[in-house]
UniProtKB/Swiss-Prot annotation:
Family of this protein: Belongs to the phosphohexose mutase family.
Protein name: Phosphoglucosamine mutase
EC number, UniProt record: 5.4.2.10
Sites of Phosphoserine modification: 100
Alphabetically ordered keywords of this record: Isomerase, Magnesium, Metal-binding, Phosphoprotein
Cross-referenced PROSITE patterns: PGM_PMM (PS00710)
InterPro entries for the chain: A-D-PHexomutase_a/b/a-I (IPR005844), A-D-PHexomutase_a/b/a-I/II/III (IPR016055), A-D-PHexomutase_a/b/a-II (IPR005845), A-D-PHexomutase_a/b/a-III (IPR005846), A-D-PHexomutase_C (IPR005843), A-D-PHexomutase_C_sf (IPR036900), A-D-PHexomutase_CS (IPR016066), Alpha-D-phosphohexomutase_SF (IPR005841)
Organism: Methylorubrum extorquens (strain PA1) (Methylobacterium extorquens)
Biological process, per Gene Ontology: carbohydrate metabolic process; peptidoglycan biosynthetic process; UDP-N-acetylglucosamine biosynthetic process
Enzyme class, first EC level, given as a word: isomerase
Reaction catalyzed: alpha-D-glucosamine 1-phosphate = D-glucosamine 6-phosphate
Free-text comment on the cofactor: Binds 1 Mg(2+) ion per subunit.
Amino acid sequence: MRKHFGTDGIRGRANVVITPELALKVGQAAGVIFQRGDHRHRVVIGKDTRLSGYMIETALVAGFTSVGMDVLLLGPMPTPAVAMLTRSMRADIGVMISASHNPYEDNGIKLFGPDGFKLNDDLELEIESLIDGDMRNRLSASRDLGRAKRIESVHARYIEFAKRTLPRHVTLDGLRVVVDCANGAAYRVAPETLWELGAEVISIGVEPDGFNINHDVGSTAPETLVQKVRELRADVGIALDGDADRVLIVDEKGQKVDGDQLMAAVARSWQEDERLTQPGLVATIMSNLGLERYINSIGLTLARTAVGDRYVLEHMRQHGYNLGGEQSGHIIMSDYATTGDGLVAALQLLSVVKRRNLPVSEVCHCFEPLPQILKNVRFRSGEPLRADSVVTAIAHAKDRLGQSGRLVIRPSGTEPVIRVMAEGDDRDLVAEVVDEVVDAVTRAAA
């Protein structure tokens, strides 16, 4: 049974769940496990722009150095940049301090192995066992303590990496781009990358103050971006979240393009260029049935996984896919990155737009999404999904939807809520079955 790790690292309210004491123990435990070989061991640590990042960063430094690991501090950097730099800087482990799209009050700790991939379940459980144990006999002698220093040049390294994911002959000349960095980790690197590639760049969400990350900006609050794109007659809008591992696109008409539509557009282009390593892509159970029907219609297949980009990536690695992602905008292009990278995904889409010489609206809306309704039911304790009344309601709902729709019920991996999602050709029917299941779950959770 997991105590600390969820579907995307450790996450919770800063100084309540994510305390200095916990961060210290995470640093010590991870440091012990990843000290392999006789070389001088090092860890890279990045963070987003939350006020609590300073506190957690300092505690992690104390933890890693106390077990003899050197620490390289990157400062505010996107999660995918930390993964890339873990490999590039030959680190034994990478750490990202972020709660992604959550408000500033929350924070989290994500860990990457030396290959830049998120840790598997076994390693996370091994770290958990050490966190809850006595670490005193694992501490280094005074002469063997680690050192810590800040690295100043990392922004340029990530910008060059992102630019190199485009063919040399492809530029963004002639594109007016509005980019929303969510007052988060990409506030510096995303606008600079787009500008260096030739775009006319208008930036919003680039004034972090420790409190305003994801506040009315970013991929989970794209209304400001939509308004700016229309107002400035931009060609495209790009919204990143707080740690820039997810992206939402806005076309020139102000219409939103989610992860499903983005994957469809890229999959079609990569299929034509024979760039797909498998004849299909990987998505989660939350991706729209319209995506699956479209992918099948062009001769490709859609593999589904549990929710979470780690499970998408796991399936991609096991079965040889190089394209996958989530409706929420976590897009993984494994030719370039070991995790979701919002900026790289946006660049790959813009490459398709430039190649086709068409407006974003004509490239991105490959299919008509089926009506999809998602509702959350908050609960305090227990397992309401095991209640007989809920089991009966779920079975009845699935019978009503039949072959023309889908029903997905799952507990969130990051907060105490149960998500109820249904989709199908008949919007009224979808709404009815969602309400029925939500009512049953709500009563069981009371």
